[in-house]
Each structure stands twice: as structure tokens, then as C-alpha cells.
A protein has these predicted regions:
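Short solvent-exposed strand/turn elements
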Residues: 22, 91-112
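Short conserved beta-strand and strand-loop elements enriched in small hydrophobics
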Residues: 17-22, 60-74
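N-terminal helix initiation/capping motif
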Residues: 1-43, 116-140
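Extended Gly/Ser/Thr-rich low-complexity repeat segments
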Residues: 60-63, 107-118
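Short beta-strand-centered aromatic/proline hotspots
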Residues: 77-84
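Short, conserved beta-turn/loop elements at beta-strand boundaries and strand-helix junctions
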Residues: 22-24, 45, 84-90
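Short strand-loop-strand
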Residues: 25-65, 96
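Hydrophobic core residues within well-ordered beta-strands of beta-rich domains
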Residues: 13, 36, 62, 75-77, ...
Length: 140
């Protein structure tokens, strides 16, 4: 049943998916930080985890915009940073984000993730005609 989608539809990014994050709210204060590059670790319909070398203090509620591209689809998400783990080299920190809104519905996001998983299942540099277009997603 699709009520439990979160348990079954989560894409661990075997590919390097670069994204940008902008902090838009700290506690009760509306802010707009500079965009910072991050690398997505996993994506689900209602959350993402990302890696960065930047420390973000989570003692206050932090809301951020995260944008990236997946299968030529621009994704823009807004959510609260809900967890922080220290992970070490080459990135220092892993953050979890609970998504509250975005340019896709949760169901549209799940469908895109399923499509992406099928699309990349057999992608290697040797067998893919799309390699040149997506080579920046490959873990080196």
C-alpha cells in the first residue's frame, strides 16, 4: 500500500548529485543566505539527506530551500533541517531535511524517484548513450 511509500521508495544516490542550499529561516527570523553547494546522499518523497563540509547549528529551527536536477527535471524543495551527523572525510557533516513543500507533490516525487532508479539501474560508462549527459553524476 502506498501509505508506506517512504519505507520503500528512497533513492540512495550511487551517483554524485550536486545541489544548492539556501537558508531561508532561522528560528522566527526570515533570512536569505548565499547559495552553498551540497551533495545529496539520499532522496525520498518527503525528505533528503545531504553532505557538506559546512557546519550548521541546529539549536534553532532551520528552514532551507534545496534545488537540484534529476532526469532533466528541476527540483525545488523547502524543508526543516532535522538531524546532523558527523561523518568525516571528504565531507564533515550529514544533514537530514524533512520536506514541507516543493515544486512537485510527494507522489510526483516518488514517481520520479522510481523512474530514476529504473533509468540508472544499468548505467555504466561503457554501455550508456546518456553517459556524456550524466557523467557529472557518476561517483569517481
Amino acid at each position: 500500500d502506498m501509505e508506506n511509500k517512504r519505507s520503500f521508495v528512497r533513492m540512495d544516490t550511487l551517483y554524485k548529485i550536486e545541489a544548492e542550499i539556501v537558508i531561508i529561516k532561522i528560528g522566527d527570523y526570515i533570512v536569505r543566505s548565499e547559495a552553498n553547494k551540497i551533495v545529496l546522499k539520499d532522496i525520498s518523497g518527503n525528505g533528503v539527506a545531504f553532505l557538506t563540509d559546512k557546519y550548521i547549528d541546529l539549536s534553532k529551527e532551520i528552514t532551507a530551500e534545496i534545488s537540484f536536477k534529476l532526469l532533466n527535471t528541476d527540483i525545488e524543495l523547502v524543508g526543516d533541517l532535522v538531524r546532523l551527523e558527523t561523518v568525516g572525510d571528504p565531507f564533515d557533516y550529514l544533514y537530514g531535511v524533512k520536506v514541507s513543500s516543493g515544486n512537485l507533490t510527494e507522489d510526483e516525487m516518488y514517481k520520479l524517484l522510481m523512474k530514476t532508479g529504473v533509468y540508472f539501474k544499468n548505467v555504466t560508462p561503457e554501455n550508456s548513450s546518456i553517459w556524456k549527459e550524466y557523467k557529472n553524476l557518476w561517483v569517481e
